[in-house]
A protein has these predicted regions:
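Catalytic alpha/beta active-site cores
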Residues: 1-164
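Glycine-rich anion/phosphate-binding loop at the beta-strand->alpha-helix junction
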Residues: 131, 157-183
């Protein structure tokens, strides 16, 4: 960490509850304002966010100084497995979004475009499907009473990149351009 790492990702598989004590052990000796913290989690994303918030508050860190995110993405789970691990996935997305509202630089919704690429879609299809998934999150959450200005900044996209270097760069640039026009 002291030699240039600026982002950490923790893969927390399984469906067990994650406690504040677990989070304290995980984040021991990590300067949370200096390093972006990301979580890839199973079903219990809410307990991970609760534990993370508790550690941040205990350390007295201002929420706006925290950077990172968590992979709350029921559409990707549905695409990959045909089901979600909870009955009302978009309600959970909304709850997690509201829970982390003060954390301006912490993304709580991830659009997993890589799933489309890994399933055989072309670069253009991956881009189109990913943007459509992002719009679906905007639609569901604005229908649930949230404002687009609350939702859009909390969404991040996770794209795959392949060996077609210049096409992949064009895809990423097009994604930024098109998403800016959507929101």
């Amino acid at each position: 960490l002291n030699r240039g790492v600026n982002s950490l990702g923790f893969v927390l598989n399984g469906c067990q509850e994650f406690t504040k004590a677990d989070m304290e052990v995980l984040l021991k000796d990590i300067c949370l304002e200096c390093v972006e913290i990301n979580f890839v989690a199973g079903c219990k994303k809410g307990s991970i966010l609760d534990a993370f918030k508790a550690v941040v508050e205990e350390r007295g860190i201002a929420p706006e100084k925290i950077q990172g995110g968590i992979n709350v993405d029921p559409l990707t789970a549905l695409t990959r497995k045909g089901k979600n691990c909870c009955d009302k996935p978009f309600e959970n997305v909304k709850v997690n979004l509201e829970k982390m509202a003060a954390y301006k630089n912490f993304k709580t919704i991830e659009v997993g475009g890589y799933v489309f690429n890994n399933s055989g879609s072309s670069i253009v299809q991956e881009l189109g499907f990913s943007l459509a998934a992002g719009v679906e999150y905007l639609d569901k959450l604005t229908d649930a009473g949230m404002k687009i200005d609350e939702v859009a900044p909390k969404i991040r996209f996770h794209f795959a990149t392949g060996s077609k270097y210049f096409m992949e760069i064009a895809k990423l640039r097009a994604a930024r351009y098109l998403w800016a026009h959507i929101v």
